[in-house]
A protein has these predicted regions:
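Partner-binding and oligomerization surfaces adjacent to conserved cores of proteins
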Residues: 1-278
Length: 278
């Protein structure tokens, strides 16, 4: 085994160095050609917490306000949120505490490697062309540096983190609905949905998505004028391996970069393993 191959198959109490990005074969080819990943916008995500338009949900207030002005500015703020916010989504490995490790079921779970970010069968089905695409393995600390390099006067980098999965939505609703929250009086609501106390909700999803075990990078780019305006990040040398799906056609030759290792995932009685190709 290579050092990387060994690390990718370590027990679940070990390495937190890698992030995993599932993609189709056609998208993988574009990624390798450009050495970059395309950031997603909010409108094309699957979770309603991301793609919903908060300005259409109304607001609560007290005192005398100019409703026409507030409605206009909240709509403008909602459009800014859709235009400016970009993200990249990865899977990460699951880990057990030393106490959890004593559980016999957890030890069996570790033996079959289903805790690994590259071994999520539903992700292979949904995002990697039903097991015929690829899973890209990035070194986390190197990709963090690449992502932070996007920062400039227009681009605000939000701290990358694991997604918080919860069905408790009262805090989100209050934050986005109460225009007088925080015992403050503001007169310009045109950036209301991008204020500091609301940014943490860009890292929140409903519990129905918890099996994705997502790790998200997010930024606000105020130079963008449309949700469809493309933005990319050059990942430098952070791509360390490409894992091909079990249904990846043997007649195809995926041209991966020379310094990137290549594996194929194999499923035996539902247990995943890696076969070194390059």
């Amino acid at each position: 085994m290579t050092n990387l191959e060994d690390r990718l198959q370590q027990p679940m109490t070990g390495d937190d160095s890698f992030l995993y990005h599932y993609t189709s074969l056609s998208s993988a080819c574009k990624i390798f050609e450009s050495n970059s990943l395309k950031l997603s916008n909010l409108t094309n995500t699957n979770d309603p917490l991301d793609f919903f338009s908060p300005e259409n949900c109304g607001f609560s207030s007290c005192g005398d306000i100019d409703y026409k002005k507030v409605f206009y500015e909240l709509r403008l703020s909602g459009q800014k949120r859709r235009n400016y916010v970009r993200m990249l989504c990865f899977c990460k490995d699951l880990f057990c505490t030393s106490e959890e490790w004593k559980n016999e079921k957890n030890q069996d779970f570790a033996d079959n490697l289903l805790f690994k970010g590259w071994a999520r069968s539903r992700m292979w089905a949904q995002y990697a062309d039903n097991h015929s695409g690829a899973c890209l393995v990035f070194y986390k600390s190197e990709f963090q540096k690449a992502f932070k390099s996007l920062s400039n006067d227009d681009v605000e980098i939000l701290s990358d983190r694991a997604i918080n999965y919860t069905n408790y939505l009262a805090e989100l609703e209050t934050s986005l609905e109460d225009i007088n929250s925080g015992a403050r009086v503001i007169y310009d609501y045109s950036s209301f949905y991008l204020e500091e106390d609301k940014k943490k909700f860009l890292f929140q999803k409903c519990q129905d998505y918890r099996d994705e075990n997502e790790y998200r990078f997010c930024l606000i780019n105020r130079a963008l004028n449309s949700p469809d305006e493309a933005m990319f990040v050059n990942y430098g040398t952070s791509l360390k391996a490409v894992i091909l799906g079990q249904r990846f056609s043997t007649s195809l030759n995926l041209a991966t970069p020379d310094n990137v290792e290549q594996f194929k995932i194999m499923w035996t009685f539902g247990r995943p393993s890696l076969l070194k190709i390059k």
